[in-house]
Design a protein with these regions (language model features):
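N-terminal nucleotide-binding beta1-loop-alpha1 segment
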Residues: 1-17
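Short glycine-rich anion-binding loops that position phosphate/pyrophosphate groups of nucleotides
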Residues: 11-13, 103-106
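Short, well-formed alpha-helical segments that are part of the catalytic scaffolds
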Residues: 16-39
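Conserved N-terminal catalytic core of the sugar/cofactor nucleotidyltransferase
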Residues: 31-96
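Acidic metal-phosphate-binding loop of nucleotide-sugar-dependent transferases
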Residues: 76-77, 105-107
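Conserved donor-nucleotide/metal-binding helix-loop-beta segment in metal-dependent transferases, i.e.
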Residues: 85-87, 93, 106-122
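Short aromatic-hydrophobic micro-motifs that form the base-stacking/packing surface
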Residues: 97-101
Length: 122
C-alpha cells in the first residue's frame, strides 16, 4: 500500500502573500517542510500541487532542487477549489492513497503522520 504526500501550494494569501517563500535560516518555509516530510519512511513520494496561476519557475526550481514531483493544474477552478486540485493530482500520479498537507506550517509532527499511515495500513 503506497502513500503520496500532496502539498497544496498557494502564494496568494491575503494576510501574508508568499509566506511559503519566507526564509528561516536560509531555507524557505516550503523547503523546510519538504525536508521534514522526506523523513517519513511510509511515504512513496512528495508532490507539490499548484495552479497554473502560480509562479511556475519558482516551484519548478524548488521541486528540482528538493527532488520532489510537481503537479500544475491547468486552466481550471483549482486555484480556489483545492479539492479538485488534490483529486486531479492524485489521478495524474495514479496515487493509491494520499496525505494532504498545507505548506504554510513547516513544523508539523512527522512522527504523527507516520503513525497515522501505519494505523491506516492495519
Amino acid at each position: 500500500m503506497k502513500f503520496d504526500i500532496i502539498l497544496q501550494c498557494r502564494t496568494r494569501s491575503r494576510r501574508l502573500p508568499n509566506k511559503i517563500f519566507y526564509k528561516i535560516r536560509g531555507n524557505t518555509i516550503l523547503e523546510i517542510l519538504i525536508s521534514n516530510l522526506k523523513k517519513i519512511r511510509q511515504a512513496n513520494r512528495i508532490i507539490l500541487a499548484i495552479s497554473s496561476n502560480e509562479n511556475l519557475e519558482i516551484f519548478k526550481k524548488i521541486a528540482k532542487k528538493n527532488e520532489v514531483n510537481l503537479f500544475i493544474a491547468q486552466n481550471d477552478l483549482s486555484e480556489n477549489n483545492v479539492l479538485t486540485r488534490f483529486y486531479r493530482c492524485s489521478k495524474e500520479y495514479n496515487s493509491e492513497n494520499i496525505v494532504r498537507i498545507t505548506p504554510d506550517c513547516p513544523f508539523i509532527n512527522i512522527h504523527m503522520i507516520e503513525q497515522m499511515i501505519i494505523y491506516y495500513k492495519k
